[in-house]
A protein has these predicted regions:
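Glycine/Thr-rich beta-alpha phosphate-binding loop at enzyme active sites
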Residues: 149-165, 196-258
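Catalytic cores of alpha/beta
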Residues: 37-45, 120-130, 190-203, 252-257, ...
Length: 278
């Protein structure tokens, strides 16, 4: 009698994020991974063997941004605070490298940032024009956009995402610029996250992603001054997971038919399962 067990049946983990079909529920969060840099430094086959079901690149803006002064990153007892400042080369330089992504075996949701509705829409319009003109196979599979409305707003230093009216204006401008799937990334730094969610959906967003990082500060123990060059930054990691779960659950209850992407402190498969269960 053979003690060899039959192979376990394959489990279908595929899901749909609105119109976007995903092989499984795991999507990388914007800013956590640069696929081109990783492929260049560590694994030339990474684009073809990409493990995530979709790729959300670091936020791109209409004009180049140098980001915040260093230091930009520091650890905490249960997470990391970063203050990168949306450093990026601007949409036109960013578009110029899209050909290098053509081998990426996953749909792409482009993260878009800005300081005004016009800036957000300008990024999307430039990308739409390029994608429409590009020959097949020369660009990645861009399925939609994630609107990062948690970036600083120059008017009074506020966050766009903290103001439902400003959020709706950004989403409306972007909705007019594309027919592709549109996610709005919500800030957790508000009293009621569902207010901005309702504003985004009312203005034409197809889905919501949450949460972005929590505004936080670390002091230099020697000088007792803020450690980061920007004074404050965004806290991520295990410390924020219970709060992120609560917010995702609130949004899921408020908008039960809306596609959602949950994030914040996911370190293990069980962490991811908790977000799915919300």
């Amino acid at each position: 009698v053979s003690d060899r067990r039959p192979p376990a049946p394959e489990t279908d983990l595929s899901v749909r994020l609105g119109p976007v079909e995903l092989a499984h529920p795991l999507v990388d969060a914007s800013g956590t991974l640069d696929v081109l840099e990783y492929a260049r430094r560590y694994d030339g086959d990474y684009l073809a063997d990409f493990p995530y079901a979709a790729y959300v690149p670091k936020t791109v803006t209409a004009d180049p941004r140098t980001g915040n002064p260093p230091p930009r990153v520091t650890e905490t007892p249960s997470g990391v605070i970063n203050a990168i400042g949306l450093e990026n080369p601007g949409v036109h330089a960013w578009i110029a490298q899209l050909g290098e992504w053509a081998a990426l075996r996953a749909p792409v949701l482009v993260s878009v940032g800005g300081n005004s509705p016009e800036q957000y829409a300008a990024v999307i319009s430039a990308l739409e024009a390029h994608l429409a003109a590009a020959p097949p196979g020369t660009v990645p599979d861009v399925r939609g956009y994630e609107l990062n409305v948690s970036c600083p707003n120059v008017v009074g230093g506020l966050q766009i995402g903290a103001d439902p009216t400003a959020t709706a204006e950004v989403v409306g401008a972007c909705r007019a610029a594309t027919a592709r799937f549109l996610l709005t990334k919500l800030t957790p730094n508000v009293r009621d996250v569902t207010e901005a969610g309702a504003a985004a959906l009312g203005a034409g967003a197809d889905g919501l992603s949450l949460v972005n990082t929590f505004k936080a500060m670390v002091l230099d123990r020697d000088t007792l001054r803020p450690f980061l060059g920007n004074r404050t930054g965004g806290l991520c990691g295990p410390a924020i997971k219970p709060i992120a779960l609560r917010m995702v659950a609130e949004v899921a209850r408020a908008f039960p038919d809306t596609p959602l992407v949950g994030m914040g402190g996911v370190m293990t498969g069980l962490d991811a399962l908790e977000f799915i269960a919300c």
